[in-house]
């Protein structure tokens, strides 16, 4: 692994490492109306989430709770209930959930098959080749996350 990792590579290492830990249940609610798919996720307090890569531009809303969000451009913001935003294609977020959080995304589509929707709307980076457990542990410590946090990817 190179001595100096890019921000994206650091997220890849972290995602790979978190994938080795026990996963947290983050229930989903899927709603379909004519021409619109709404996906709502519940994320419990204390969870570290790394999203899939979004393929489409779409609105999102924080319905309840509060989270610190790191974006690939290096920006870090705290969002809370009532926050509305637009996700751009290529976006991949890392969230630390400060309070139990409900987050919804809205997608114009007539597709209702969930497996097809996941492939249509998102992709996942290939992180299976990483062997950066030691560096990932150092990243977790620098982020102030416990040695074996509850996590989901």
What residue spans do the PLM features occupy?
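Short acidic-glycine-tyrosine-enriched beta hairpin
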Residues: 33, 40, 72-93
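Short histidine-centered beta-strand/loop micro-motifs
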Residues: 49-54, 71, 77, 95-96
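Glycine- and acidic-residue-biased ligand/ion/polar-headgroup-sensing regions
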Residues: 54-73
């Amino acid at each position: 692994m190179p001595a100096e990792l890019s921000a994206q590579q650091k997220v890849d290492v972290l995602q790979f490492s978190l994938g080795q830990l026990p996963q947290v249940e983050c229930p989903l609610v899927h709603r379909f109306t004519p021409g619109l798919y709404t996906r709502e996720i519940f994320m419990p307090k204390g969870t570290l989430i790394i999203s899939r890569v979004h393929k489409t531009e779409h609105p999102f809303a924080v319905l309840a709770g509060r989270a610190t969000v790191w974006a690939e451009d290096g920006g870090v913001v705290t969002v809370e209930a009532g926050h509305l935003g637009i996700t751009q294609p290529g976006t991949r977020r890392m969230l630390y959930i400060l309070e139990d959080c409900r987050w919804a995304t809205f997608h114009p589509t007539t597709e209702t098959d969930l497996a097809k929707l996941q492939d249509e709307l998102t992709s996942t980076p290939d992180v299976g080749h990483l062997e950066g457990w030691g560096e990932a542990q150092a990243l977790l410590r620098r982020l102030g996350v416990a040695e074996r946090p509850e996590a989901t990817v």
